Structure formats: structure tokens, C-alpha cells
């Protein structure tokens, strides 16, 4: 097998098959992701993971999955996993415009900032179309840019719903040593906050605990 060295990159699982294979989603933004996008079949790749925690859906009858940007990759994975287990799932995706839309299914709620595809507006416009009969039994999970997750967190709080967010901080070492992936969360200590590691304590957090900048 061929082996190729590239810099470490945070990778998001997009789909998973029962035969042990999975697909990843990559957005080319630099040298490392550009190299990954050119990988050919048969290349040997070293992976470290999965890192940290994940979404906990236990105790909820309904789940709303919200994604934007590269956040739609894990949202798609969660959708396939939940629906295969009989969960009632609603997906809302947000993009800047039609040219950036990926992984959209007919059952998904689609929004674009400029309105050239789907509902015009942010994902909040899409979430407002969902009929939520029992907020206490509905969980919303969100992955995407910080401003989007902050807005979804506020929306969920207003509706009286629990919200989990998956922070996309870059994980340099993946072992909890380098502290590059810290997130500021609320704490009862004297400072009122503490820094926790995405690769260990995260990347999924209760949105009410995150201190949004």
C-alpha cells in the first residue's frame, strides 16, 4: 500500500456503512485539505479518533438537527443513524447561496441567506417553520459556524428546548495536551468561567453552558 504524509486535519464523518467503511466530508481551505481531496484508492491513512464526546439523544422523542457549512457532514451522519433506529428527526440546513448547497435531501428544510434556493434567511427562518408540540421532549443539535450556533442556542432557549452544540475548534494534538482547542464555558468559580478542551470534554456541549463571544 502507498503511504503519504500530510499535516493533521480535523475530519468529519459523513456516512457510515455496516461493512466498516465510512465517507468523510472535506472542504478545501488550505494545503492539508487540498492534499486530502486528492487521495486515491489504496492510500494508507493514519487516523486518530473518534475524539471527545458525542450527541446524547436519550430521553427525547423528537430531534432537530441543524447544520451549516461543513457542519452538514456530521448532521447527515446523525440523521442516517437516528432514522435507522426509528427516531423522529427533522433536519434544517443553512447555506449562503445555492452554489454551496450540499447533502440536501427532499425531507430536509433548506435555507439560503440570499433566498436563491429554499427559504430565504438563516437557519432560524427554517426552524420557525417547525411545529414543536412538546419542547421538553424535543432536542435540538447544531453544528456549524459560531454565529449560527449562537443564534440557534438563543432560539432553543426561547422555545424552552435543550440544545447541544458541537464546537469546531481545531484539534492540533488530539490528546488534550496542547490546549489549542479550548472552549470557554460557565463555571461557579471566582472567574465565572473555565476553559475546557474540545478533544476531551467536548466537542459537544450544552449550549447554555457555552460563553458565546
Please provide the spans of the model-predicted regions.
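A generic structural signal for residues embedded in beta-strands
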Residues: 1-2, 47, 183
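Ferredoxin-reductase
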Residues: 1-41
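Iron-sulfur (Fe-S) cluster-binding modules
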Residues: 4-11, 62, 84, 88, ...
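Residues in well-ordered beta-strands of folded domains
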Residues: 15, 25-27, 46-48, 92, ...
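A residue-level signal for beta-strand positions that form part of recognition/binding surfaces
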Residues: 21, 44, 196
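FNR/FR-type flavoprotein reductase catalytic core
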Residues: 31-170
Amino acid at each position: 500500500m502507498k503511504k503519504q504524509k500530510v499535516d493533521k486535519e480535523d475530519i468529519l464523518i459523513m456516512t457510515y456503512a455496516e461493512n466498516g467503511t465510512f465517507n468523510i466530508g472535506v472542504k478545501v481551505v488550505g494545503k492539508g485539505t487540498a492534499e486530502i481531496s486528492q487521495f486515491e484508492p489504496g492510500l494508507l491513512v493514519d487516523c486518530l479518533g473518534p475524539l471527545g464526546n458525542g450527541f446524547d439523544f436519550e430521553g427525547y422523542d423528537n430531534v432537530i438537527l441543524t447544520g451549516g457549512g461543513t457542519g452538514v457532514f456530521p448532521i447527515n451522519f446523525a440523521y442516517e443513524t437516528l432514522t435507522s433506529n426509528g427516531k423522529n428527526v427533522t433536519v434544517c440546513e443553512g447555506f449562503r447561496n445555492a452554489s454551496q448547497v450540499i447533502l440536501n435531501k427532499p425531507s430536509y428544510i433548506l435555507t439560503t441567506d440570499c433566498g436563491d434556493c429554499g427559504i430565504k434567511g438563516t437557519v432560524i427562518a427554517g426552524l420557525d417553520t417547525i411545529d414543536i408540540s412538546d419542547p421538553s421532549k424535543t432536542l435540538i443539535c447544531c453544528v456549524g459556524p459560531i454565529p449560527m450556533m449562537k443564534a440557534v442556542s438563543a432560539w432553543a432557549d426561547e422555545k424552552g428546548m435543550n440544545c447541544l452544540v458541537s464546537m469546531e475548534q481545531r484539534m492540533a494534538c488530539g490528546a488534550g495536551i496542547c490546549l489549542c482547542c479550548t472552549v470557554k464555558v460557565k463555571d461557579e468559580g471566582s472567574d465565572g468561567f473555565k476553559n475546557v478542551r474540545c478533544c476531551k470534554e467536548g466537542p459537544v456541549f450544552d449550549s447554555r453552558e457555552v460563553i458565546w463571544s
